[in-house]
Amino acid sequence: MDRIRIVGGNKLNGTIPISGAKNAALPLMIAALLTEETLILDNVPRLADVAQLQRILGNHGVDIMSAGKRSGDHEYQGQTLHISAANVIDTTAPYELVSKMRASFWVIAPLLARMHETKVSLPGGCAIGTRPVDLLIMALEKLGAEVAIDGGYVIAKAPGGLTGAEVDFPKVTVSGTHVALMAATLAKGTTVITNAACEPEIVDVADCLNKMGARVSGAGTPRIVIEGVSRLGGARHTVLPDRIETGTYAMAVAMTGGDVLLRGARPELLQSALDVLTEAGAVITPNNEGIRVARNGAGINPVIVSTAPFPGFPTDLQAQLMALMTRAKGSSHITETIFENRFMHVQELARFGARIHLDGETATIEGIGILRGAPVMATDLRASVSLVIAGLAAEGETMVNRVYHLDRGFERLEEKLSGCGASIERISD
C-alpha cells in the first residue's frame, strides 16, 4: 500500500496547474447515458474515482475512449473522454462497483429516464456520516417513478417514461439536484426544482445538458426549470476547474509561506474560501492566468468559519482550513453544518501536536507555533490532504498512510507540490 513521505519546512514557490473538477466530471460522465450519441469531455482529471466510474459505465455497455497529453511543465489539459452509450446492455449497477464510490449511484437518473427501468445498489464512498439517498428517491418518485428497495438495491421503474413535476427539496442537496436535473431532461412536460443546490458543478452539468439539446434554465439559483425533450444528442464540453483543489493548494501556500500561481483557477468558484484566506493573512491576486497566492513574513491569523452550501464556505475545504489554523496566532472556531461526523481528521492532526477541542459540530483550534512531523493515517479524501498540508509545515518527517483516499480526488498531488519546492514523495511498498 502506498504512503507519502514529507519533510516539512519548505516554502512553496512556482506554478501549480489546476485540474478539472472531479465533482463536475463524474456527473458529466454519467450524463452520457442520456443519449445514444457520443459525448466528448475535455479536461477530465485522471483520478481513481474517474477510473472507477469508467468501469461502472463499461458494465452498462458504455464505450469510453481516453486521450490526453502533456505539453509542458505547467500546461496539462487532463484527459479527453469520448463516451458512447449507444448500446446500453445492462441497467443494473451491482454492489461490487457502486459500493466503492457514492456518486456512481447517480446512474439511476439517466438509466431510468432513457431506459425506463434500472436496478442500482445502495452506494459507498467516503465514510462521512449517513448521507442517505432518501432525497434522491423522493425526487424520482415525484417524477412518476415506482421505486422499491430490496436486498440492498434500489429498483426504479417508469414504464411510460417520467413526467415533469414540482420537486421541492426540504434541504439543499447536491446529489438530489444532480439526479432530479438529469432525470427531468427526458421527462414529459416541465419540471421545477426548488431549493436546488447552487454549486458551480451543477451549473457546469446544466451547461453540458443544454449543449446536448436539453432545455434547462436557472442552474446556479435555488430554482431550476427543465422543459423535457424527447431525446438528447451528443456534444463537446470542457470540465470547469476544480475549486476544491484550488482552495487546497491556496491553503498549503498560506500554511508554508511562499508565492504560487494556481494556473487556470477561477476566483468566482470559491470566493468565500478566498475571503477566509485573506482574513487569515494570505495575499490573493486573481489575474488572467489564474489566482496568485502568497504569504510572506506575516503569521497566520485565526478565523471563525461555518461551512455552508455554495456560495458559502465549502465543507470540502473544512479539514484543510483546520490544518492551517493549527499554526494561527490565537484561537479559531470551525463549525460543520453540512455533514455529521466530519471531524475524523482531528485525532490525526493532534499527532502533529495540534490542540483541537470538539464541542458537537464545532471545533476550537488553539494555534501553536510549531507542528512536529508524525506518522498519520488518512480517513477520507479531504481529511487526507489536510494531513499533507500539516506535514508541509511540520518540523521533521511526516508519513501519510492510506493515500488511496488522496488518489480519489487529487491528480498528481506529489508532482504538483514538489514542483514548487516541497519535499514530498510517494513510497510504494
Swiss-Prot record:
The record's listing under SUPFAM superfamilies reads: EPT/RTPC-like
Residues the record lists as binding phosphoenolpyruvate? 22-23
- Keyword Cytoplasm found: yes
GO terms, biological process: cell division; cell wall organization; peptidoglycan biosynthetic process; regulation of cell shape; UDP-N-acetylgalactosamine biosynthetic process
Pathway(s) of this molecule:
Cell wall biogenesis; peptidoglycan biosynthesis
GO CC field: cytoplasm
Presence of the UniProt keyword Kinase in the record: no
Please provide the record's keywords in A-Z order. Answer: Cell cycle, Cell division, Cell shape, Cell wall biogenesis/degradation, Cytoplasm, Peptidoglycan synthesis, Pyruvate, Transferase
Question: What is the official name of this protein in its record?
Answer: UDP-N-acetylglucosamine 1-carboxyvinyltransferase
Name its species.
Answer: Nitrobacter hamburgensis (strain DSM 10229 / NCIMB 13809 / X14)
